[in-house]
Amino acid sequence: MTFKVWDSSRISTKLNNLIFIFIMKKVFSFILAASMMLAGTVAMAQPSIGIGFANSTDKVKSGSTTNSTNLSGFYVGGSYNINLAGALNVAPGVYYSLLTKSDADSYFGLVDTKVDVTEHYLSVPVMFNVGLNLSDGIVGRVYAGPTLAYGLASNTKVKGTVAGFSKDTKIDNYDDDYNYRRFDVMLGGGVAIDFFDMVRFNVGYDYGLVNRYSGDGDITRHRGQLNVG
């Protein structure tokens, strides 16, 4: 007869992850609902649709060692700029981001490896901004605020080739074995210029406050994202 011994530390980690996911889902739902209700009830809201370049930096720190991974792609989405008072506005929105990275190595011309990482995010920013008229039809803005980010998917595809024979392996980075949280609360800001209420040029940066490493040990994992568009 055998008895299965449960790992109490692993159970505790999974329980903490479940609690974290539950709380973040509630916060995400609340911010999304509040943003859409606010945008829909304010008559003076100015809608805008944007697309641009995105660069994400994922930093994992363990002790004194820090490893960084850069992914590039694009973002697309929309927001409502709602006037609160005077030059002060708030702009809730919803955006989708696609980020990718590809690395290839060859060993002695005999073994080739290729690693592709792809991530998909849904983000709900609530940015407060102050506008300043620079000239007729041109408005400069400085903005800052929180963004709630949710990882829709994150996959790593590994392809190895030896003497002409190849094999592909696809990894779900959100699998429990990889201790990678989907949710993040980011804080950031940037500057923008509006041209005749038709075109906006924007440069912004957001930094993730949540440690996305969900396992045990003295390890932290944070993500930052640069948006230009």
Set out the residue ranges of the language-model regions.
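Outer-membrane beta-barrel channels and translocator barrels
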Residues: A39, N83-A85, N133-G137, F196-M198
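Transmembrane beta-barrel domains of outer membrane proteins
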Residues: S79-N81, M127-G131, G190-D194, N202
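Hydrophobic, lipid-facing positions within transmembrane beta-strands of outer-membrane proteins
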Residues: S72-G78, L122-V126, V185-G189, D197, ...
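Short glycine/proline- and aromatic-enriched beta-strand/turn motifs that initiate or cap beta-hairpins
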Residues: A43-Y80, G131, D136-V139, A144, ...
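Outer-membrane beta-barrel "beta-signal"
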Residues: S48-G50, I193, H222-G229
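Repeated loop/turn-to-beta-strand initiation elements of outer-membrane beta-barrel proteins
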Residues: P47-I49, A87-V90, D197-V203
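Sec/Tat signal peptide C-region and signal peptidase I cleavage site
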Residues: F22-I23, T41-A45
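Extracellular/periplasm-exposed beta-strand and loop segments of Gram-negative cell-envelope proteins
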Residues: T57-N70, L99-Y121, G151-D184, N211-R221
